[in-house]
Structure formats: structure tokens, C-alpha cells
């Protein structure tokens, strides 16, 4: 009897040890997948409400987009400092300086990211949910440190890194991209002991996401470009140059606001961010109406339509979307640039298709999508893998890789890394820098 009790006690201790070593982490990864799916549905619901309002009264964005912008920035400034913008620079900053984790990866920040980005998409802002999902995943996993009896800075960093990678993978349904993103963008190094942790988190969160949403391709399947064609080479070169320059200029504009913004507007942004956000909302509404509504939101529908060859867009779509994204990000509202960047890239491919018929529109759109995303993030491998996994365009692997690499190199001649420059500003500032502050963007 006593031996049976000893065995039972030993088994209980083993179960507790297994839970302490693995259970907390697995639970966190499952929660990341669950929250990512709910957040995606939440954002989609918000944009459907916006589209319904615009269908009822096409002029309505002129009223509620500026008011919503002012409300969103007011709430962010007062309650959710650190939730501004994409969220990826914040995650990078915490991985490089663990002292920032409690400020930038808290559950309060996660809540603010979800709520304020919902307000933004509800008002038609040009923002995506993928970047915020990275910070949401990192914040949620970082909170799981409380489940460990003895936490450490190493454990906290591993949790945040795994949560960020799992968040991106769940947002795009691109498991491989989650691992590559963590290695190339978040840590800028390959550490073998991280890979098991990353893959485990991505598996658990991915299973939850697939269970709730089913197996799907983010942008569907694009028509194949049959075999290699010499006509693809000049298109590839032109796409690389156009997207590399456009992505580099985008980063330069956001990182050097003080150099180009008129002084009165610059001072308004610094001293009265809520008023500045109101005017950003006016700009977004005007651009949206000028584009007949195509620049509102993330741009997912427009990009997918171009990839499937059933969308007709203005040659100026990419330029108008570019302006709407600049205004959205300068306002300081929580929201990502991944999906809007893909939409801008697809728009550039649409413009290229007007001057050449040798390459199908879906192929041009895919090339410009990967090129522009790579130029903005300066993470060519991540960009190539994301687009490749999202569109099931395996027949275009080599061209996508080439464009991503060339566009990144061109972008680097114009501006430094967008995310890492912002992360450096978070680290070097003695206080939390809001993106509405000129010191942070």
C-alpha cells in the first residue's frame, strides 16, 4: 500500500514538473491561436460595419473618420501608451532590452491594441491586423511567465519571441513564415535552441487557427505562369526597381518627419496629437472618396481581386493607397502595415500590367507584392516566404526570391531598416515614445 502511494506521489510530481516545463507554454500558444482568430474576426466585422455605413451614405467618412481618429489617439495617449503603430518595433525593442517588456508587452497593451485598432478599421483607416497580432501574441505569451515557479529573463524572452512568431503565423496562416520572421526580423540571428520553442508555439497556435477557420490560403491560388519565360526577366527587374524605390521612400518619409513636414504641422503633431490625428482622418476620408472607396481598410479585397484577375483598379490606386497608409501611420493609431503594403504592391503590379501584356496580371501583382513588402520591412526572406505561402505560387519561387532580394537592396540605399530604427528609438528614449511624437518616427 505504501509503495503504491509512493508511486502515485512520484507520478504526481512528474506531472507537475511536465506542466511547469511544457504545459504553461503549450497553453499560451493555444491562447495565441485563439486570440489571433478572434481578433481577425473582430477586425473583419469592424470593416464590414464601415462598408455598410459607406454604402448607406458615401459621404459619411468625412464625418466619422476624423472623429474616430481623434477618439482613437486620445484613448491611446491616455490609457495605452506603447500600443501605437504596428507593434513589431515594440517587440524587437523588448527582445533587445528586457527592461521594456513590462511596459510594451503587458495585457493592458494587448487590450489597447485590439480595441483601438478596431476603432481604426471601423473608421476606414488604412491599417492591417498582422503587425498588431505579433505584439498581441508576444504580450500574451509574456504574461504566461506568471505560470512558472521561477521565471527568468531568458524564459521571458523565449516566451515573447515564440508568441510573436506564432502571432504572425496565425495571422497569415503561414507557419514557415513565422519561424523565418523570428530569425530574420526579430532576433537577426539563428540560435538553434530557439527553433524548437518557435516551432512548438507555431504548431499549437496554428492548430487552433486551422480548427476555427479551416485550411485556407490567405490570398487564394494564383493562375500559374507556365514555365520560365524570358519576358519575365525585364518585368522582374522593373518590378524590383519600382518597389524598391517606393518601399524605401515610404520608410524614409516615416522615419524623417522633421525633415519634410511643414513646421506648423510638425508642432501640431508634437504638442496636440489628437488634433493632428483629426486632420489625418480628414486626409484618409478625402483620399478614400477620391479612390471610390478602394483605399479604405487593409486592402485585402483589392489585392486578392488583382491576384484572381477579377478586380479593375485605377492606375493611381497604389499612389492613393500609399498616401492613405502614410496618413494612417503618422496619426499614431495602433495598426499594421503588412496587409496595406501587400495591397500597394499589388497596385503597382496593376499599373505595370497596363504597359505590358507579356506577363499576366496575377504574376505581376505577386512580384510587386513581395518586392514592396521586402523593401518596406527590409526582410527579403520573410517577405518571400509570406507571399509564397499565402498565394500557393510555388511555380514562381525563383522570381519571387529575386525580386525580394533586389528590392531590399535598393531600399537600403534610401533608408535604414524601418522596424529596427523605430525599435532603437524605443530603447534609447527615457520614456515611452508615442508614434505621434517626432522622436519616435
Where are these predicted regions, by residue range?
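Alpha-helical transmembrane segments and immediately membrane-proximal extracytoplasmic
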Residues: 1-441
Amino acid at each position: 500500500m505504501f509503495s503504491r502511494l509512493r508511486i502515485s506521489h512520484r507520478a504526481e510530481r512528474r506531472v507537475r514538473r511536465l506542466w511547469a516545463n511544457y504545459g504553461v507554454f503549450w497553453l499560451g500558444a493555444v491562447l495565441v491561436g485563439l486570440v489571433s482568430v478572434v481578433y481577425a474576426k473582430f477586425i473583419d466585422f469592424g470593416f464590414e460595419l464601415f462598408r455598410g455605413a459607406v454604402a448607406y451614405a458615401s459621404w459619411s467618412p468625412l464625418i466619422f473618420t476624423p472623429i474616430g481618429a481623434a477618439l482613437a489617439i486620445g484613448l491611446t495617449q491616455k490609457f495605452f501608451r506603447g500600443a501605437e503603430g504596428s507593434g513589431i518595433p515594440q517587440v524587437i525593442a523588448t527582445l533587445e532590452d528586457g527592461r521594456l517588456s513590462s511596459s510594451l508587452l503587458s495585457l493592458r497593451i494587448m487590450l489597447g491594441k485590439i480595441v483601438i485598432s478596431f476603432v481604426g478599421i471601423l473608421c476606414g483607416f488604412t491599417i492591417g491586423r498582422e503587425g498588431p497580432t505579433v505584439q498581441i501574441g508576444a504580450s500574451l505569451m509574456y504574461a504566461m511567465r506568471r505560470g512558472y515557479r521561477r521565471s527568468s529573463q531568458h524564459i521571458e524572452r523565449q516566451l515573447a519571441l515564440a508568441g510573436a512568431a506564432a502571432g504572425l503565423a496565425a495571422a497569415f496562416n503561414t507557419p514557415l513564415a513565422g519561424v523565418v520572421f523570428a530569425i530574420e526580423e526579430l532576433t537577426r540571428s539563428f540560435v538553434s535552441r530557439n527553433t524548437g520553442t518557435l516551432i512548438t508555439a507555431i504548431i499549437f497556435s496554428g492548430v487552433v487557427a486551422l480548427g476555427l477557420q479551416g485550411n485556407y490560403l490567405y490570398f487564394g491560388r494564383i493562375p500559374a505562369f507556365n514555365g520560365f519565360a524570358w519576358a519575365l526577366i525585364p518585368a522582374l527587374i522593373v518590378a524590383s526597381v519600382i518597389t524598391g524605390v517606393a518601399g524605401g521612400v515610404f520608410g524614409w518619409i516615416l522615419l524623417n518627419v522633421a525633415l519634410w513636414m511643414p513646421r506648423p504641422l510638425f508642432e501640431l503633431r508634437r504638442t496636440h496629437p489628437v488634433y493632428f490625428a483629426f486632420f489625418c482622418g480628414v486626409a484618409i476620408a478625402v483620399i478614400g472618396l477620391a479612390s471610390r472607396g478602394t483605399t479604405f481598410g487593409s486592402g485585402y479585397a483589392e489585392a486578392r481581386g488583382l491576384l484572381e484577375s477579377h478586380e479593375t483598379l485605377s492606375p493611381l490606386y497604389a499612389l492613393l493607397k500609399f498616401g492613405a497608409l502614410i496618413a494612417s501611420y503618422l496619426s499614431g493609431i495602433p495598426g499594421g502595415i503588412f496587409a496595406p503594403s501587400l495591397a500597394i504592391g499589388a497596385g503597382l503590379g496593376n499599373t505595370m500590367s497596363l504597359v505590358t501584356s507579356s506577363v499576366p496580371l496575377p504574376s505581376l501583382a505577386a512580384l510587386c507584392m513581395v518586392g514592396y513588402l521586402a523593401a518596406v520591412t527590409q526582410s527579403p526572406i520573410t517577405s518571400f516566404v509570406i507571399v509564397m505561402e499565402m498565394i500557393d505560387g510555388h511555380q514562381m519561387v525563383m522570381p519571387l526570391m529575386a525580386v525580394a532580394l533586389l528590392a531590399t537592396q535598393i531600399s537600403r540605399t534610401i533608408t535604414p531598416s524601418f522596424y529596427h530604427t523605430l525599435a532603437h528609438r524605443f530603447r534609447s528614449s527615457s520614456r515611452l515614445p508615442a508614434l505621434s511624437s517626432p522622436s519616435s518616427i
